Every structure is written in C-alpha cells, then in structure tokens.
C-alpha cells in the first residue's frame, strides 16, 4: 500500500481532519459532471458539503483532475468539474488509464468507494447506486457498483436504486455477494424518486448508533465488502409513482430506439426523465441527496465514536 499515497492528493480540510482523527464522509463527483446540469450541480455539491460539516463531519468530494486523484476538492476544482465538457465518467476499469493519460474523471459509486477505502474513509454519501439494467438477461449490463459493494469496506448511504434499473435483480446480485441491505428507519427498499419499490430490505435500523455497531462488527469480523444504507427520499419530495413510472418507461423506450447503451445510458435517462417530468425529478434528486448527507454525517460521527 505504500505506493498508493503518491496518487492521492488531499484537500487541506481533509488533510487536517485525517491528522486530527475527525470523521470524514466521502462524496462522488459523477453527480456533478454527469448527474445534474450547471449551476444546480455545483450549488448542490456545495450545500451537501456544508450539511456534512454542520453534522460534525468533514466532506471529501472525490474526483480526478489532470490525472491526480483528489480526496476533497477546492472551490476552483468543483467549478471546473461542474462546467467542463471533457470529464470522463470514471469507474474501476477507468482509473489507471485516466491517471496515466492525465485526464479529468468524475468518480462513480464504484471508484469513489475504492478511493475512499484507500484514504481510510468508511462512509460515503450518494444519490442512488447503480445496478442491473432492464434487459440484462440479454445485454449483461450490470453496474460495476455491485461488484465493488461485494469487496470494498465502505458503507454507502443512498436512496436505493433508480427505478430505471431492474430493482429485483439488483437486490438478488447483492444478496449473492453477501452485501447487507439495511433500511434506515424503513422496512421498504426505496426506489430513489419514491419511498417504496415493492421490495423489502434485509434489516431495518432505528438509529445511526445501531447501524454503526453493525458496521464495526462486520469489519471487525473481516467480512469484506460494503453495506447499502437505504434511506428513503423525504415524503414531501417523493414523486407520484404513476408519473415517475410512466416517465421512466418512456425514457427507457427512447434509449432503446436510439441504441444508447453502456455508461451513456444513465445520464441519457436522467436528462430525459427531467424533461418529461418538467424538472420535478431533478428537484427530488437534489432533496434526496441532502437527506442522505444528513444521515451520512451522523453515521460517520457515530462510527468514529466506536473507534
């Protein structure tokens, strides 16, 4: 592991937090470059960072800038990622090439988990995780996020899986790999824009202290892999199920008709759904990320107390 440090560059705030042994929360950057339009992307990222600070933890937004892995971003780097058009969506397979070619990369759930683990960060906040795409029986289009959750020791606080995916198969894959699906104050697995997906979670926890004890036990026992912390979107911002289902079905059909596949699929679908819902889906997306940031900060603080 001694060669790792030469690839990582820590923002001053994160460096100080590590030196002082303070709780840190990792954040991904795909949401900035590929998940939301400018300026909402930068505004959301800044507010999420502030919410984590208010919760007693230190935010570390992760990205790659000119081939350097950044653990925590400066304001300039954040603006650059939010506006630049030449930012690669970087998952596990992309990291070595982006570094070697000195490119700019926005980290997905998978690559953020990898970098968080290298930096010793145990809690990561995102909107939703990737999963098994609809029709994967033919295409084998399965997000690398699931394999990462199977092997990397980071807890991922999310609002479940976007219903653009096959949620049932996604949960089956996670079960096969022994990844616990934990509902935060819920028995229902959320579907990103809505509070329920029709599927349950493995366990529900009442508070972050209970969740922190479970994480500590998991990793103390050397049970490798992450945990999905499913935190439903607040009721006030949840979308109407019929409306969002119709929008998603329409977007999925258009993507198929246009032959859109691979890593282009999710950004295309999100943009299309935003159009169809007249911006309501973007508002929901922003609010669920804020809600996850709040719980993520509390969890990082609770886990830190146990160590």
Curated annotation (Swiss-Prot):
Give the residues the record marks as binding Mn(2+): 141
Query: Which reaction is the catalytic activity of this chain?
Result: D-ribose 5-phosphate + uracil = psi-UMP + H2O
**Which cofactor is recorded for it?**
Mn(2+)
| Metal-binding keyword on record | yes
In alphabetical order, the GO MF annotations are: hydrolase activity, acting on glycosyl bonds; metal ion binding; pseudouridylate synthase activity
Note describing how the cofactor binds: Binds 1 Mn(2+) ion per subunit.
Active site: residue positions: 28, 162
Keywords for the protein's UniProt record, in alphabetical order: Glycosidase, Hydrolase, Lyase, Manganese, Metal-binding
- Residues the record lists as binding substrate: 89, 109, 143-145
Summary of subunit composition and partner proteins: Homotrimer.
Q: What does this protein do?
A: Catalyzes the reversible cleavage of pseudouridine 5'-phosphate (PsiMP) to ribose 5-phosphate and uracil. Functions biologically in the cleavage direction, as part of a pseudouridine degradation pathway.
Family that this chain belongs to: Belongs to the pseudouridine-5'-phosphate glycosidase family.
* Protein's UniProt name: Pseudouridine-5'-phosphate glycosidase
Which species does this protein come from?
A: Alkaliphilus metalliredigens (strain QYMF)
């Amino acid at each position: 592991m001694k060669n790792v440090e030469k690839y990582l560059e820590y923002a001053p705030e994160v460096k100080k937090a590590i030196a002082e042994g303070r709780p840190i929360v990792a954040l991904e950057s795909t949401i900035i470059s590929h998940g939301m339009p400018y300026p909402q992307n930068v505004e959301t990222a800044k507010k999420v960072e502030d919410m984590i600070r208010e919760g007693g933890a230190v935010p570390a937004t992760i990205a790659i800038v000119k081939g350097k892995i950044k653990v925590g971003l400066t304001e300039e780097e954040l603006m650059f990622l939010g506006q630049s058009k030449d930012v690669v969506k970087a998952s596990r397979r992309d990291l070595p090439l982006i570094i070697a070619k000195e490119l700019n990369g926005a980290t997905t759930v998978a690559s953020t988990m990898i970098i968080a683990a290298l930096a010793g960060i145990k809690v990561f906040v995102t909107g939703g995780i990737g999963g098994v795409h609809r029709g994967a029986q033919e295409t084998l289009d399965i997000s690398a996020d699931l394999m990462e959750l199977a092997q990397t020791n980071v807890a991922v606080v999310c609002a479940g899986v976007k219903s653009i995916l096959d949620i049932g198969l996604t949960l089956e894959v996670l079960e096969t790999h022994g990844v616990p699906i934990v509902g935060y104050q819920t028995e229902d697995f959320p579907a990103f824009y809505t509070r329920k997906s029709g599927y349950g979670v493995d366990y529900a926890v009442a508070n972050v202290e209970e969740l922190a004890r479970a994480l500590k036990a998991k990793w103390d026992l050397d049970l490798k892999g992450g945990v999905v912390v499913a935190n439903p979107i607040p009721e006030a911002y949840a979308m109407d199920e019929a409306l969002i289902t119709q929008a998603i079905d329409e977007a999925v059909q258009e993507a198929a008709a246009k032959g859109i596949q691979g890593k282009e699929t999710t950004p295309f679908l999100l943009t299309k759904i935003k159009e169809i819902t007249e911006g309501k889906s973007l508002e929901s997306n922003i609010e669920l990320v804020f809600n996850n940031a709040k719980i993520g900060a509390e969890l990082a603080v609770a886990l830190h107390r146990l160590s």
